[in-house]
Design a protein with these regions (language model features):
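Conserved phosphate/anionic-ligand binding catalytic regions in large, soluble enzymes, centered on
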Residues: 1-7
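Phosphate-handling active-site elements
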Residues: 8-15, 43-45, 183
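A short, small-residue-rich loop immediately preceding and capping a beta-strand
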Residues: 10-26, 51-54
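Patatin-like phospholipase A catalytic core
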Residues: 11-13, 29-30, 214, 247-248
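Intrinsic-disorder/low-complexity recognition with aromatic hotspots
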Residues: 27-28, 37
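Long mid-to-C-terminal assembly/interaction modules of large eukaryotic proteins
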Residues: 30-32, 65-66
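A glycine-rich helix N-cap at a beta->alpha junction
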Residues: 38-57
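Thiamine diphosphate
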Residues: 55-75, 83-88, 96-100, 105-298
Length: 298
């Protein structure tokens, strides 16, 4: 259906876009037809429509329905496309949904290369985030892909960058910000909605949010897995300090949402301890990386 157009001009599309979706854990069933569609879109001489995949009820939270419903590893299949041919957005706050999606849709409408949009959302009924407390107070910040929740406090030693992705993971990082500040921990906290959107931002903005040097001084807190971090090119020690749903390389069990999040180590206490360890070890982390580089020039 999305391959059909009523336009006689091959450069213009006059047809419909389509959407299909299910639990994030089951969306791999849709991967093969979506991949074939992406290949067709790439090679078509005519403008075509855009396929939407809704990976709903994604993340560890859905284990409340049973182990079969975990949307942790499964949604990683949506990274298996040539870069630039899909836009994947992972949303955690209600106010991120509209700007994040419409930014992706605007790009897809203008760029014939983009044939698929993947929308990943979780189920929990979290309170709407108070953006007056964020460093980036823009209500449409999600359109930029990555945005700053907390910036470094000027005049104090910096302890690194924390990149968040997913619902419970980001909500619980926000919950411990005041506690981190009371403990003297000065980290920059970034919400990662979509690396695909972030890649399309001006270089000045990208450098202001996540400069290249920050990649080797970062950890991430994600409701996904350690195999697929929120952004690429992170440093060699990032995995050692990051928190993900597969932190112990085991399939998780199931239970109440609170129990599931605690087992995944994405509860506020686990997040606070991990960020504190990351901050406390900063000098040691940087020294270890310096020693690795030094071995290359000996």
């Amino acid at each position: 259906m999305i391959s059909q157009s009523a336009s006689v001009d091959p450069e213009k599309f006059s047809g419909v876009w389509a959407l299909s979706g299910t639990y994030g854990a089951f969306t791999p069933l849709m991967y093969t037809p979506a991949r074939v569609w992406s290949q067709q879109n790439q090679d078509s001489k005519f403008r075509t429509g855009v396929l939407h995949i809704l990976a709903g009820h994604s993340g560890p939270e859905t284990a409340a329905d049973g182990r079969t419903h975990f949307g942790i590893f499964a949604t990683q299949v949506w990274k298996l496309f040539p870069r630039g041919q899909v836009i994947h957005i992972n949303l955690w706050d209600y106010n991120d949904v509209a700007p994040g999606y419409f930014a992706a849709a605007e790009i897809a409408a203008r760029d014939p290369k983009v044939g698929v949009i993947i929308i990943e959302v979780a189920r929990p009924d979290f309170p709407v985030a108070d953006r007056n407390t964020f460093a980036d107070k823009d209500l449409t910040a999600a359109r930029k892909g990555l945005y700053v929740i907390r910036d470094f406090t000027p005049g104090k030693p910096k302890h690194g960058t924390v990149i968040c992705q997913g619902s419970s993971s980001t909500v619980n990082v926000v919950k411990v910000i005041s506690r981190l500040e009371e403990a003297g921990i000065n980290v920059k906290i970034i919400s990662a909605i979509s690396e695909d959107l972030f890649d399309r931002q001006p270089q000045d903005y990208r450098n202001s949010v996540l400069p290249p040097e920050a990649l080797v001084d970062a950890m991430f807190v994600s409701s996904a897995t350690r195999r697929v971090p929120p952004v690429r090119d992170l440093g060699p020690l990032t995995d050692e300090y990051s928190l993900t749903s597969d932190w112990d390389n085991q399939w998780l069990t199931s239970g109440l949402e609170k129990e599931v999040i605690e087992e995944a180590h994405l509860d506020p206490e686990s997040i606070f301890k991990s960020i504190k360890r990351f901050a406390d070890d900063r000098a040691k982390r940087l020294e270890r990386q310096k020693s690795l580089l030094a071995k290359l020039v000996d």
